[in-house]
């Protein structure tokens, strides 16, 4: 559903899925099924295989447009290396692509997004809302260049995991884990954001400022930031022009014409209570 909103941006482009086994990835299957519908120029998919646990070599799938506009050509080749997205082999493929669409390993998400941004590539990535903790994502959000996607935001989804991972097991013996706060991240335009309709009014009693305390709750000379605390996005006061700390879920509703993101607060205190991480607007 997410990709349907980016048809114009996908048309005529080389898409790279660099964390996807061509034989089993739902991303690859979907893009192959919709190769002509989206007007892709080419689709490339590679994946990682740990050489310590498997003697198999990872494969590379290349799908390209046939001379017949109604068809396409599929080619499977063996990679020389282990298929790690950070390898020279996979970075060379990345450099030849236009758009990266994949579900990076959550444990390597920071490394992945840093590489993609450094490569100056367009991306549509499945991740979690907590990626806002990564400096490269926060910088992109502050600059208005990165945001979450169109699709229903902040969901819990199940992901298949290797046998040695902690997780649950389905009826067909596939092990999976539940991951909370799932969302899409992209640097493509997301045009469905509208200004929030705000109806609450500021008062010091309802919107206290953060205490002058350090990360352990000990008193300090100054507060970490001169901002009021807002516990819910719906409670943002309509008549306050100063700095506000709001829930990170605002990213999924943010209209950059209404608010400017200036930073993030990780360890704010209201009285003796430590509040959840806040986006500063």
For each of these PLM feature ranges, what is it?
Residues 1-281:
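Class I S-adenosyl-L-methionine-dependent methyltransferase catalytic core
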